[in-house]
């Protein structure tokens, strides 16, 4: 329930989420999430409902209005094989929502699609990001 998420975090389906308006590389963002109180991760997205929620969360945050990309926890382990991608929190990639891979290996949500579709982007680029944690 709501009472399980700390101030600043928003609940959805037994997890808590927060979009951060700090410019970080994918690795820095994942480290930042892990440093949060309960050891969060960059957000994994495992259903259409969760994708809608994360998109809504980003759009609610005025400081993110100028962001073109927002990091999520997807990272390709190997350029050629999408099937070896995984979420940074260890969730398996059973729900798929990608546009393309190329040689960009870190997952982001793209403003052009209303932060609704995943794109693979250059991991060293600096972007805002969304963390996700289990509240207990």
Swiss-Prot record:
It comes from the Eukaryota. SMART domains: CLECT. Gene3D superfamilies: Mannose-Binding Protein A, subunit A. This is Snaclec rhodocytin subunit alpha. It is found in: Secreted. It comes from Calloselasma rhodostoma (Malayan pit viper). Elicits platelet aggregation by the binding to the C-type lectin domain family 1 member B (CLEC1B/CLEC2). Binding leads to tyrosine phosphorylation in the cytoplasmic tail of CLEC1B, which promotes the binding of spleen tyrosine kinase (Syk), subsequent activation of PLC-gamma-2, and platelet activation and aggregation. Binding to GPIbalpha (GP1BA) and alpha-2/beta-1 (ITGA2/ITGB1) may also induce aggregation, but this is controversial. Keywords: Disulfide bond, Hemostasis impairing toxin, Metal-binding, Platelet aggregation activating toxin, Secreted, Toxin. Its main location: secreted. Disulfide bonds join 5-16, 33-131, 106-123. Pfam families: Lectin_C (PF00059). Belongs to the snaclec family. Residues 12-132 form the C-type lectin domain. Dimer (non-covalently linked) of heterodimers of subunits alpha and beta (disulfide-linked). One of its GO terms (cellular component) is extracellular region. Expressed by the venom gland. GO terms for biological process: regulation of cytokine activity. InterPro entries: C-type_lectin-like, C-type_lectin-like/link_sf, C-type_lectin/snaclec_domain, C-type_lectin_CS, CTDL_fold.
